């Protein structure tokens, strides 16, 4: 939709990967719609995943005992976080939709993306106490997880060896994104591209493009336990 701004946080080492293709077709389709698309290519950026005292540029509030959450909160209020964090926060703040594109690692995100979440979505910027879940500071924004798996779709069902995929989305979609206020759209899951045929991979890409054509009309999922653990 013309005028909309999208941040695509991309976490894969190889541009020629299937994740790279998913990222590229998303950029192309959203740009065709008139959206302004910004990509944070975390590996290319050599993004620092570790949350350390180096994230604070000024004096610590307690130099004797370092507590990252408290120090990041105080530093955010004083605009004393490092420039890489502030830049990513600026991108998030400007975005109407944030898409995370990544391969599933151990039922979660790659370490570099986990580090992005740890460092960027800090207290004061993304949430406060009170000021989380439906009252989170990013409540006017949409978020979507688009990821690939190593296994087939059948493996991520209730009867499958990995269980229903919604189980492992609970901490990511609910405990992270919804906690910060995001309205979470249904995930885009590309099951087993490495074990799929070229034709099947083309279908996955086409399905993603087709979905993006009407992405602004989608309703968020109900971020309640019933979505993840019932049905």
Curated annotation (Swiss-Prot):
Residues the record lists as Phosphoserine modifications: 197
Subunit structure: Homodimer.
UniProt enzyme class: oxidoreductase
SUPFAM superfamilies recorded: Flavoproteins
Cofactor: how and how many bound: Binds 1 zinc ion per subunit.
Binding-site list for Zn(2+): 174, 178, 223
GO biological process: memory; positive regulation of ERK1 and ERK2 cascade; positive regulation of neuron apoptotic process; positive regulation of reactive oxygen species metabolic process; positive regulation of vascular associated smooth muscle cell proliferation; quinone catabolic process
Gene name in the database record: Nqo2
Keywords tagged on the record: Cytoplasm, FAD, Flavoprotein, Metal-binding, Oxidoreductase, Phosphoprotein, Zinc
Role this protein plays: The enzyme apparently serves as a quinone reductase in connection with conjugation reactions of hydroquinones involved in detoxification pathways as well as in biosynthetic processes such as the vitamin K-dependent gamma-carboxylation of glutamate residues in prothrombin synthesis.
Binding site for substrate: 127-129
Chain positions recorded as FAD binding sites: 12, 18-21, 104-107, 148-151, 156, 194, 201
Stored PANTHER family: NAD P H OXIDOREDUCTASE-RELATED (PTHR10204), RIBOSYLDIHYDRONICOTINAMIDE DEHYDROGENASE [QUINONE] (PTHR10204:SF33)
EC number, as in UniProt: 1.10.5.1
Chief location: cytoplasm
Family that this chain belongs to: Belongs to the NAD(P)H dehydrogenase (quinone) family.
Catalytic activity: 1-(beta-D-ribofuranosyl)-1,4-dihydronicotinamide + a quinone + H(+) = beta-nicotinamide D-riboside + a quinol
Cross-referenced InterPro entries: Flavodoxin_fold, Flavoprotein-like_sf, NAD(P)H_dehydrogenase_qn
GO-annotated cellular components: cytosol
Record's protein name: Ribosyldihydronicotinamide dehydrogenase [quinone]
Domain of life: Eukaryota
Subcellular location: Cytoplasm
């Amino acid at each position: 939709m013309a005028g909309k701004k999208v941040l695509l946080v991309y976490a894969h080492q190889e541009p020629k990967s299937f994740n790279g293709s998913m990222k590229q077709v998303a950029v192309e389709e959203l740009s065709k719609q008139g959206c302004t698309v910004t990509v944070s290519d975390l590996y290319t950026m050599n993004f620092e995943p570790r949350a350390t005292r180096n994230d604070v540029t000024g004096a610590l509030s307690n130099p004797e005992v370092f507590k990252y959450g408290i120090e990041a909160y105080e530093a955010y209020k004083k605009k004393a976080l490092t420039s890489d964090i502030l830049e990513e926060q600026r991108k998030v703040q400007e975005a109407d939709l944030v898409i995370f594109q990544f391969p599933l690692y151990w039922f979660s995100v790659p370490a570099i993306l986990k580090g992005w979440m740890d460092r960027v979505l800090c207290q004061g910027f993304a949430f406060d106490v009170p000021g989380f879940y439906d009252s989170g500071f990013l409540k006017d924004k949409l978020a979507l997880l688009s990821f690939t798996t190593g296994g087939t779709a059948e493996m991520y069902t209730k009867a499958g060896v990995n269980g229903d995929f919604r189980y492992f989305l609970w901490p990511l979609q609910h405990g992270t994104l919804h906690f910060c206020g995001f309205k979470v759209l249904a995930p885009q899951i590309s099951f087993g591209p490495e074990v799929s045929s070229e034709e099947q991979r083309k279908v996955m890409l086409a399905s993603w493009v087709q979905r993006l054509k009407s992405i602004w009309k989608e309703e968020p999922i109900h971020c309640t336990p019933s979505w993840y653990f019932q049905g």
